[in-house]
Amino acid sequence: MKSAELRQAFLDYFASQGHTKVSSSSLVPANDPTLLFTNAGMNQFKDVFLGRESRDYTRATSSQRCVRAGGKHNDLENVGYTARHHTFFEMLGNFSFGDYFKREAIKFAWEFLTGTLGLPEERLWVTVHVSDDEAADIWLKEMGVSAERFSRLDEDNFWQMGDTGPCGPSSEIFYDHGADVPGGPPGSADEDLDRYIEIWNLVFMQYDRQPDGELQPLPKPSVDTGMGLERIAAVLQGVHSNYEIDLFQALLQAAAKATGCTDLEEKSLRVIADHIRSASFLICDGVIPSNEGRGYVLRRIIRRALRHGHKLGQDKPFFSTLVAALVAEMGEAYPELGREQARIEKALLAEEEQFGRTLAAGMKVLESAIEQLDGRVLPGDVLFNLYDTHGFPPDLTADVARERDLSVDMDGFEAAMAAQRERARGAGSFANDYSDRLNIDAITDFSGYEKLADDNTVVALYKDGAAVDTLNAGEEGMVVLDRTPFYAESGGQVGDTGALIADEARFMVTDTRKRQAAHVHVGKQVSGSLTIGGKVSACVDVDRRLAVMRNHSATHLMHAALRNVLGEHVQQKGSLVSADYLRFDFSHGEAVSEAQREEIEILVNRQILANTAVTTELMDIESAREAGAMALFGEKYDDQVRVLSMGSDGFSKELCGGTHVNRTGDIGLFRITLEASAAAGVRRIEAVTGEHALAVMRRQERALSEIAATVKSSLDNAADRVRSQAQKVRELEKEIERLKQKLASGAGGDLTSEVQDINGVKVLATQIDGADGKTLRVTMDKLKDKLGSAVIVLAAVEGEKVALVAGVTKDLTTKYKAGDLLKFVAEQVDGRGGGRPDMAQGGGNNPAALPGALESVKAWVAE
């Protein structure tokens, strides 16, 4: 049975049993920053199992695409070297949300395996948890499974979502490949060998684990099952390795053709075939190669595949060409793969071209390090150098080491990385900035959402990194209050500035930072003194704060607009929100076009004109996700989060602790000022709002008015007029070039009279007025043809620069080299140059010395 037929048979069987067919979810988990990639069929139903979400069905079935290549579930290093490890796989599953339980789940599984697929019962082995008498009775007494092919196991047969929450026993079904294959049954010492292969896991969620470890029965027990498509396909197709099934054969052949490898058993081909699946589907689902988070895992996968291609002798881009074979194999099951084929190929090719430039050099460094190795462990500093200089992820280096029976010093690598991070922190800090080193016990309440001025108490003072009781006039330091309206730098938003005032004392705040639970006001005591326990009025710079708020709110609107215009793959990669402008880095593989920029601006300004209220709501993190609020992967959120909503019809909803305008109309105006690359796969937009946006538009209008006046046109017709003038300039430049060539041709004829005979050799060394380098080269070719046999040097002067061309006809190159002659002349005019024996060019910076340099050519030939 083909894999596609197997996938369809599974879904059809469970649909016939009252299950709703649910499409595979994205490999990027929706609103779940705790999960790197979708790695199981139940991921998209997690909130249903937890009771946080309800759906209009209680039975579901799916074929879920999954990736395991990072974090807790990481199969990357084993891929290609074992029969069943993959970075990408499909998980067939059936699910019950408080509907059926153990009896039906077991019956469905047994009926599908032995009935629909026709697997012999004597080839199947079943396990249950040691405590699960109910499941054991169903298998042994109702399904008729032989006690000789049945076992009770402990922790291997108990599943839990986390330290607390839903959990329960599981039942696993194994396929026995026969006595001629090494290995023992589940639970034996040899269970990890290849004879008995797990093909299906049935999880019975019947308990809720409490913080104290107690297992309380769930009111609605549920079922979550998973069967790897590739594994069961291998069983049905009579092969022991997943790489031998039909899904991989076309990919292996395409990889072999692309790399020139003829051995389809080659492990590197298996790596490439596996990795084109995971890389393509990840890009399809919006992940872009980068140096952080999901993008970094994708980059590691791609670079590992490229390294194996290089190992097979392929040093040109090849990986992106395999996408077509993948689409042909899986495009029918996943139509989105075909729709995104061009984008996937483009992203892979860009990564190949970028890494290809350093792969060969990095491999030379690694090979050299291995040759010089004294022992069997590759040092951590070698791994660090390869990563830092050549972009080699450490697991790629470990992959090479593994092939040579070497191990790697990962602890040494981590130590080198930590040292680099420490150096970076030191380099990025001001000499007198001690705030990073402070350990502050105080807790500051933030009142800045409601107030821009507040009366507070000083609870801590610091000078030169040390706690003090008093700050006096003229001293720089840091002040901690019990409560403050000053926003501390966080989430890309800059810290507030302003003043702390008490009677005659004034402390000017130049920055506000968060250290532990305290807000640290950084600045200078300009008059009077502050003491611990003293009262102050904390006054935020209102105009600056309002400008920051406009830019922060505009950032949210722009983020939503980017996802609307460019696609759901857009994810925030970094941001800066200041009073003057906003900067936003996001995942996207190509430049944003002018038309797209305009559409983004229109969408944002439309929301500004709508002048809708900006609302914030405090809720727990799970409720926020359920409400559709965007969460950033890798961010750590408190149990209670602020959900910020703005724009009409739910235009933008994100988790955010920053300060924002009350209504979108308060932003005033939005204008993009820059769009550029920030890193591979990451674009950057800078924009301004309010009066800054108006100032930008006024400057642009003034510039346009000046251009229109220069070309004698109205503003509306200025662009057409400039295009017309530019075309005329191009035509005139062509005419000038034509006249130069004509001049050179005429000059070439005139110059023959200057030829001198030096020891039987025709020699010409002269300056041509008004010529450039190209004219000199054309003239040289004409003179060589005309003279037949000669040594020639031509020069031209433009300003303070000298252009030189030397030529020697073919018959004289054994004795005279144009490169040597050019170097001889160029050095005399403070320049340099070089070239072939028959033609060389260069220049200099001393026109005054040119006559003497040309005169010396005759002596050079005569030597």
UniProtKB/Swiss-Prot annotation:
Binding positions for Zn(2+) per the UniProt entry: H552, H556, C656, H660
InterPro entries hit by this protein: aa-tRNA-synth_II/BPL/LPL, Ala-tRNA-lgiase_IIc, Ala-tRNA-ligase_IIc_anticod-bd, Ala-tRNA-synth_IIc_core, Ala-tRNA-synth_IIc_N, Ala-tRNA_ligase, Ala_tRNA_ligase_euk/bac, DHHA1_dom
A GO term, aspect molecular function: zinc ion binding
GO biological process, one term: alanyl-tRNA aminoacylation
Transmembrane spans: none
Cofactors that this protein relies on: Zn(2+)
Cofactor note: Binds 1 zinc ion per subunit.
Pfam families in UniProt: DHHA1 (PF02272), tRNA-synt_2c (PF01411), tRNA_SAD (PF07973)
Recorded GO CC terms: cytosol
Record field: catalytic activity: tRNA(Ala) + L-alanine + ATP = L-alanyl-tRNA(Ala) + AMP + diphosphate
Designated name of the protein: Alanine--tRNA ligase
